[in-house]
Amino acid sequence: GKKTWTSFSREALYDINSFLKLAVPSAVMVCLEYWSFEMLILLSGLLPKPQLEMSVLSICLSTTSLAYMIPFGLGAAVSTRVSNELGAGRSRAARLSAHVALCMSAMEALVIGSILFCIRNVLGYAYSNEGEVVDYVSSMMPLFASSTVMDGIQSVLSGIARGCGWQKLGAYANLGAYYVVGIPIAVILAFVLHFGGRGLWLGILCGICAQTILLFIITLRTDWGKQA
């Protein structure tokens, strides 16, 4: 080990500012999205039936995390592919990669969303034997399946944004979508209009839709020639 370790060198910090300009906004972009879902669980503890609401929303969050892995992988792949193609000056190839990944994510999201909707009456039993919890999970499935579809599409759009170096723009989009649109609507629906856990999830669905629309507009208006 000592023969291969040459000790730390200041050269490792060379051009660190360029790295941080991408790394920090990228971390903020991801964290803002993940934290918004965690806030739902915290807010559910303030509802009239906290144990039931927290159980159901935890089930939804666990399931959406599982379903998110496939589009997350597509997002990581398209991020690498787009950045490589743009770096090589192949703007048309980068654009084609983005379009193919978007089509794949849309088809995958529709399939997963449809499956979740079809098994809505039995999915709850994978987590709980309590009839009240299972019935509540079943009633949440239309909203949950819709959010799964939108989340799958935005995952690839986020990957395209990272591949193009739009981390800062993506962070602003996520901030606005989740903390200006999603969470406030969730709070109003859950606590003012008394929709409970459904209101919380409907609010975050509005946030996902806003995020997807913003990222889609950014991608649609991209001049791929200038990006390369």
In which residue ranges do the predicted regions lie?
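Helix-terminus/linker motif at the lipid-water interface of multi-pass membrane proteins
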Residues: 6, 27, 31-62, 66, ...
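Short loop-to-helix capping motifs
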Residues: 49-50, 130, 166-167, 196
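General structural feature for long, well-ordered alpha-helical segments within catalytic domains
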Residues: 12-20, 24-27, 35-40, 53-55, ...
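A short pocket-lining beta-strand/turn micro-motif at the edge of beta-sheets
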Residues: 167-169, 185, 198
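Hydrophobic alpha-helical transmembrane bundles that constitute the permease/transmembrane domains
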Residues: 19, 27-42, 46, 66-77, ...
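Hydrophobic alpha-helical membrane segments of integral membrane proteins
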Residues: 172-173, 202
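Short alpha-helical transmembrane segments in multi-pass integral membrane proteins
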Residues: 1-24, 82-148, 181, 189-228
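Small-residue-rich hydrophobic transmembrane alpha-helices
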Residues: 56-120, 152-165, 169-170
